[in-house]
């Protein structure tokens, strides 16, 4: 892993995840992304959040995946090298952040559904357009809220290399022990809803949606 390009005082705490981290089955990547840090440079400010909920999309054999229809101009990032941002616009009102997985030419990805805000919450509230001091749990829970709070758009971020420490958006490891993981069905889709491809940090209050009623605990690591 490479050091993130922040101030010297932060370099000891964050190491950017390399391409090899994402060059794997999305199910493995999804589990291992939990507990990692999403980082955004927003002007002179730094926004960070701990990843607490993601979903895996398996590519051509996954009916719910954008890649299942084959390569298009819109989803081309999913067919490219691993570790790149795939951003799409949905429901006419919000963006969603994904990261490509698997080797170049083989589609697969992870959707980021929720993070636990750590640093820069004042700027996140501004980007969301809601009053500072509003319910912090709802600030970044859900893919649309997360993207808005981190200033993520398709024009700005689609195709961005999330392993580049010179970038203004990347994912890093701060050395914290891996969390306990819960695996359940994906949310907000119409196809392949039974597939257990949603990964959640057990007991975290920043996870999106209602309290889980059907889930199986992942192995404590």
Feature names for model-found ranges:
Residues 6-221:
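Conserved, well-structured core segments that form or line functional sites
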């Amino acid at each position: 892993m490479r050091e993130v390009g922040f101030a010297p005082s932060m370099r000891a705490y964050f190491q950017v995840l390399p391409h090899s981290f994402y060059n794997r089955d999305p199910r493995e990547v999804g589990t291992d992304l939990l507990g990692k840090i999403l980082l955004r440079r927003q002007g002179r400010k730094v926004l960070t959040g701990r990843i607490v909920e993601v979903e895996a999309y398996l590519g051509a054999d996954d009916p719910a995946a954008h890649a299942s229809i084959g390569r298009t101009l819109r989803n081309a990032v999913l067919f490219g090298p691993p570790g790149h941002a795939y951003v799409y616009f949905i429901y006419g009102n919000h963006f969603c952040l994904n990261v490509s997985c698997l080797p170049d030419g083989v589609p697969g990805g992870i959707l980021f559904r929720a993070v636990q805000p750590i640093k820069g919450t004042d700027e996140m509230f501004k980007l969301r357009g809601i009053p500072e001091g509003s319910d912090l749990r709802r600030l970044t829970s859900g893919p649309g809220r997360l993207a808005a709070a981190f200033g993520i758009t398709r024009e700005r971020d689609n195709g961005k290399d999330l392993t580049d420490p010179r970038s203004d958006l990347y994912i890093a490891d701060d050395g914290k022990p891996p969390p306990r993981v819960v695996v359940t069905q994906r949310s907000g889709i119409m196809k392949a809803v039974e597939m257990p491809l949603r990964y959640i940090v057990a007991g975290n209050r920043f996870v999106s949606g209602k309290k889980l009623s059907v889930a199986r605990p992942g192995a404590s690591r």
